[in-house]
Amino acid sequence: MRSISVLFLLIMILSCPLSAKSTAEEQNLYNECNKGNGKYSSCTKLIEILSKKCDSGNMEKCDDLGYVMGLELGMREAAFVPLEKSCKAGIAASCFNLGIHDIAIRGNVKRAAHNYSIACEKYSERLEEERIFKLKSCALKTALENCLRDQEEHDPVKCAKKAFWEISDKYDSNSTKE
């Protein structure tokens, strides 16, 4: 259970809370929801707004919705739907976060490897803020494929969690100079 909690803490640290294109209302609701302040109604209002935008095809809002549902409100299973939708549309951050969810919640290493493959392809190496995620995604894709290949010798989920932490530690300590 501790590893799941730690993985979600990592998601919170690694992910942008809301996309750069958030409205002032969305940002205010997010801040009220995030800070607790007894404003659960702010969280539900934010989910309502993001859900409508996600349903109308705004994939960045699907990414935001998955983040808020999964991290802020602990609705981890419900977070899969908007994250899957935005990952399929090529939103790299959703694919990265979905990979974490796949390992930690569902134990689906094959699916996590697939999602990291998409994130590896979609993150830009030219944008400094995305480069570290590209490096991590590409390394995780390879590591998880190895975990799946060697599953007769060890538990692929344990292997995937170990690989995730090793790769995260490596890139977090070495910055983006790899």
Roles of regions detected by a PLM:
Residues 7-15:
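Bacterial N-terminal signal peptides
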Residues 36-39, 57-59, 72, 89-92, ...:
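Short helix-capping/linker turns of helical repeat alpha-solenoids
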Residues 31, 64, 97, 142-145:
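"A position-specific structural signal for the A-helix of alpha-solenoid helical repeats
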Residues 110-125, 164:
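TPR/TPR-like (Sel1-like) alpha-helical repeat modules
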Residues 129-178:
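Terminal, low-structured helical/coil segments at or just beyond the last alpha-helical repeat
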